[in-house]
Each structure stands twice: as C-alpha cells, then as structure tokens.
Swiss-Prot record:
UniProt organism field: Arabidopsis thaliana (Mouse-ear cress)
Name the record gives this protein: Cyclin-dependent kinase inhibitor 2
Protein's GO biological process: DNA endoreduplication; negative regulation of cyclin-dependent protein serine/threonine kinase activity
Function: Binds and inhibits CYCD2-1/CDKA-1 complex kinase activity. Regulates cell division which is crucial for plant growth, development and morphogenesis. May regulate early lateral root initiation by blocking the G1/S phase transition. Controls the mitosis-to-endocycle transition and the onset of the endoreduplication cycle during leaf development through inhibition of mitotic CDKA-1 kinase complexes. Specifically targets CDKA-1.
Induction context: Down-regulated by auxin in roots.
Domain of life assignment: Eukaryota
Length: 209
C-alpha cells in the first residue's frame, strides 16, 4: 500500500511539473503572439523594459503601452489604432502641428485686431480732424466778434469825443465873439474887420509905416 501511494504521489508531481511547463510555454507563446501583432508607428518607440512609448517629434514622452500580458493583468487597451492600408497617416498628432495651428490662429486674431485698430484709429482721426476744424471755426468766429465789438466801441468813443470837441469849440468861439464884441463897443473899434467905429470915446488915427 505504501508503495502504491508513493507511485501516485510521483505521478501527481510529474503531472504538476508538466502542467507548469505547459503553462509557461503557453504564456511565452502568447507573449510572442502579442509582440508579433503590435505594429510600431512613426510616433512610437520601443523601450528596454518590454514596452513601447509614444513620442512626438520633440522627443517628449506622452503615453506608454505595456505589451507583456499576465494572467492577472487586464487586456491591453490600444491607444492608437493604425490602419495597415494607410500606414503613412499617423494617429498621434505632434506638438509642432498643434503649435503651428495655434500660432496661425493667433496670427489671424492679431491681424483682425490690427484691422480693427486701424479702422478705429481712422475713425478717431476723422473725429479729431472734424473737432479741430470746428474749434478753429468757432475760434475764428469768436475773434471776429471780438474785433467787431472793439471797432464798434472805438467808433462810438471817437464819435463821442468829436462831438464833445465840437461843443467845446462852439462854446469857446461864442465866448470869444462876445468878448470881441464887448471890446469893440468899449473901444469903438471892429477887431474882426480891423477898422475904427464912429461915434465912440476913442479916435483912431491910421499910421503909415
């Protein structure tokens, strides 16, 4: 009985060894199949640790994909599906293309902003010119008004002065005539005509030079 049990144990151990070796071979075959199925794209680079890393043109790593599967690990999720027919088109967009697109978009916005700025500057220039012309017109009108007022005041002042002078001279002339008349009556001599008057107190004799 003991010998039979030992033989059964030996058979079981041999079966276990064979099953483990078979499992290892199956795992190695699965790994080989997985490695043979994966196609490296231009933006993917293989690593030394049994995986592949997606890289852009600048060399910066973006995503990593492990190609060795284990029994406990979930299936590999394909990050980029590459079609065999159109192998030239890459599904991984590089940072240079993104930066180019972004720069072009910014350039368009800047151009539009420049156009708007030029349009608004033209409008502001027109408004400033119109305001300047209006200010110049108003200033010229104000100057003309001031000049006309000054002329009017000057003319009024001059006319008043002339009238006063005329009145003054008229009064003075009248006074002078009155005085001359009094002198003529007193001295019986006409000073305006430069000849003596008859019938007075004084007798005038003409002297020859």
């Amino acid at each position: 009985m003991a010998a039979v049990r030992r033989r059964e144990r030996d058979v079981v151990e041999e079966n276990g060894v064979t099953t483990t070796t078979v499992k290892r071979r199956k795992m190695e075959e699965e790994v080989d199949l997985v490695e043979s199925r994966i196609i490296l794209s231009p933006c993917v680079q293989a690593t030394n640790r049994g995986g592949i890393v997606a890289r852009n043109s600048a060399g910066a790593s973006e995503t990593s994909v492990v190609i060795v599967r284990r029994r406990d690990s979930p299936p590999v999720e394909e990050q980029c599906q590459i079609e065999e027919e159109d192998s030239s088109v890459s599904c991984c967009s590089t940072s240079e293309e993104k930066s180019k697109r972004r720069i072009e978009f910014v350039d368009l916005e800047e151009n539009n902003g420049d156009d708007r700025e030029t349009e608004t500057s033209w409008i502001y220039d027109d408004l400033n010119k119109s305001e300047e012309s209006m200010n110049m017109d108003s200033s010229s009108v104000a100057v003309e008004d001031v000049e006309s007022r000054r002329r009017l005041r000057k003319s009024l002042h001059e006319t008043v002065k002339e009238a006063e002078l005329e009145d003054f001279f008229q009064v003075a002339e009248k006074d002078l005539r009155n005085k001359l008349l009094e002198c003529s009556m007193k001295y019986n001599f006409d000073f305006e005509k430069d000849e003596p008057l008859g019938g007075g107190r004084y007798e005038w004799v003409k002297l020859n030079p």
